[in-house]
Amino acid sequence: MANQLILLKKDFFTDEQQAVTVADRYPQDVFAEHTHEFCELVMVWRGNGLHVLNERPYRITRGDLFYIRAEDKHSYTSVNDLVLQNIIYCPERLKLNVNWQAMIPGFQGAQWHPHWRLGSMGMNQARQVINQLEHESNGRDPLANEMAELLFGQLVMTLKRHRYATDDLPATSRETLLDKLITALANSLESSFALDAFCQQEQCSERVLRQQFRAQTGMTINQYLRQVRICHAQYLLQHSPLMISEISMQCGFEDSNYFSVVFTRETGMTPSQWRHLSNQSD
């Protein structure tokens, strides 16, 4: 695409030897679709927003982790106090003898699964390493680049150790109620979610959990679940031949008319209009 925005190495790296650096987004504003001359890891700390990656929408919030390749197209819209960090790196500049392909999904042709989650424990450990990495990447002493790359290696290993699929928090996990709740919501795309039953199972206060969720994500629990379902519906409308009534069922809406009302309110167009517009742009 001739008018595609491309983020350039020279605007982010201090010199041609620097392999990795950190770009803070406190907060992340709306950002038009773009690609890069480099790769990046995206770590979401707080708030929420709509992250569209290669035309697939994701409603993101605390704990979301993305592995972005240079050629990937992505953008940020509908942001609400969204705080994240981009750890950006140039694969060809990495010198450390590490099996990067085993650590980073999509690294130089490795199998790519872009979207993961981190629980609170993983986030805390990653944040400590990122803070050190940011300090070294801004350093000017002769060993700063080498130290930054060592810390990057530690970071990608930490992320691999703690990441999990969005709907599959390990049964042995010691993560917080908030992490368990977000995983439970991801497992409720096609069925109703009963918060009272969840709280009874976890022996926690429903009122306190609602407050914690809103404080960390900027949304209510129902708003988040609705947004996740609508994102899934957008993807199915564009990439599957399913009828709208079938998509409605797969996204937790038993009434297709109600689904259309909610979809239109959230996106500004009907499901049919979305599908038509998406097919035109393909």
From Swiss-Prot:
Q: Which residues form the HTH araC/xylS-type domain?
A: 179-277
State its location(s): Cytoplasm
UniProt-listed CDD domains = cupin_RhaR_RhaS-like_N (cd06977)
Question: One Pfam match, by short name?
Answer: AraC_binding
Q: Which residues cross the membrane?
A: none
On assembly, the entry states:
Binds DNA as a dimer.
Name under which the protein is recorded? HTH-type transcriptional activator RhaR
Annotated source species = Salmonella dublin (strain CT_02021853)
